[in-house]
Amino acid sequence: MKISVVIPVYNEVESLRELHQQLTQSLSSFEAYEILFIDDGSTDGSVDLVRLLSETDNHINLIQFHRNYGKSAALSEGFKYAKGDYIVTMDGDLQDDPAEIPNLVRKLEEGYDLVSGWKKDRKDPISKTVPSKLFNFVTRLFTGVNIHDFNCGLKIYRKAVVKTLDIYGGRHRYIPALAGQKKFKVTEIIVHHRPRIHGETKYGGARLFHGFFDLISILFLSKYIQSPIYFFGQIGLFTFLIGLAIECYVLYLKYFMGEPFAKHIALLMLGVLIIVVG
């Protein structure tokens, strides 16, 4: 059995050396493994450091993009070149703990095709956790895949899963849902999540809306052909819930965090617009 660890990297030079050390320790119990760093157009020296590490560790392979294509493209390229029977994905910022890899392997070998991490005790700011909880709830509701953390970077797959997935745009957020549509067995385990130590989060407000449209496309492709009325009814409800959640978030910022409405007027108006569309 061979393990492939696929790690998208975008400007994580401060984390990579320590990540490599932790990976080497965690993977030492496996008879064969490879580490694929997919550099997504980094400009901070990440590529040079990975090349340096590879000089003393022949388990490392580097795939380099010359500009930033996004996480879905990086994962798709990693899946294409991964040679392992099991493929692990994780982020390169040290928030995912490599020590969880043996736990993921054990769960996969219980008969599952994909095991997703669940960051139950998540070490992120509210600007990430609130949208994440909303999208996880709605994705569970509409896809029927009963996991809590669709977008957790730490996952393990059987090779058959990654070779059949079509990942582009922002669809990496919904890989468990895509796998579930193809009748693969999907489950989750609670994993240790760590606060970010180096660099800045790549999370931006735009991801909230990109994720919204990606989920619509997934639902459209899977359900529109079967029942257009049912599909568009779901979309209307989903859109209404998104708008309602945005308004609740703005109210929370106003009455619990003391931030004036004027500071978030664009978000407030967007929430109203989305509710009307729904």
Predicted region positions:
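Short, well-formed alpha-helical segments that are part of the catalytic scaffolds
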Residues: 12-26
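Short beta-strand/loop segment that forms part of the nucleotide-sugar
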Residues: 20, 31-42, 63-64
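Donor nucleotide-sugar binding loop of glycosyltransferases
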Residues: 12-15, 42, 71, 97
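Cell-envelope/extracellular polymer assembly enzymes that use nucleotide-activated donors
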Residues: 2-4, 34
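Hydrophobic helical membrane-anchoring modules
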Residues: 174-278
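Acceptor/aglycone-binding surface of glycosyltransferases and processive sugar-polymer synthases
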Residues: 52, 61-67, 71-81, 86, ...
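A conserved acidic beta->alpha catalytic loop
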Residues: 39-48, 94-95
